[in-house]
Amino acid sequence: ISKPGYWGNGTQRLEIAKLARDFGIEAGVLEKPLNHETAKANNVTPVIKHLVKTLAIEPKVIDEKFFLNIIDSGLSEEEYTEIIGVVSRITNIDLYARAIGAPLPQFPKPEIGNHSKERPPEAIKEDAWVSTIPNGPAGKEIGKDLYKGRPMPYILRALSLVPDECRSNMVLESCQYAELGRVLDFSYNHYD
C-alpha cells in the first residue's frame, strides 16, 4: 500500500488507505486504535472521498451505474481500479484484525518514487465494467504472469488493469480462501 502504484504515489495511496480506515472507525465498523493517525487527505478530491467511503462501509451499493457516475466525474478507470485495490485490501486486513481480536496494523511510511501511469496494452474491454487482462493467449506475457496459465474468473481478474493490485489481491485470496489454482477445482477440500 505504501509503494508507488500505477496511478498514485506512495503518499497518495497511504492517504486513501488511511481515509478508508477513518470511514470504518466513523461508521463504528472498526475501533479507534490508541495510536490512530487520521488521514490528511489534502489532495483527495470529493469524488475519491465518495468512492473510498462507499467502498469502505457500503460496498453493496456499488453497481455499474455507480461506476459510470464515478468515471463521468473525472476519475479514469485505471485510477478507479487502483483505489478499489487499495481500499479493499486495507478493509480486508482491518476487518480480519478485528475478527481475531488483534489491533489494527500501523501504516508504514510511504515509499519514495513516482507512479508509472502505464496502462497494460493487453488490457481490453471484456464483459466487466473496467478493462481487464484476458485469460489465455490474448493476455500475452502479463496474463501468463498474473494467472500462471490457469483460467481465472472475472472476480479474480477484476483488478488486472493495475497488475500490482491484482497480484496483491491474489495473495490475500490465497491466504484467506484457497490457492488460486484451486478456485475452480470443485473437488478440492481444505481438509485433505
Residue ranges and their predicted role:
Residues 1-192:
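Hydrophobic alpha-helical segments
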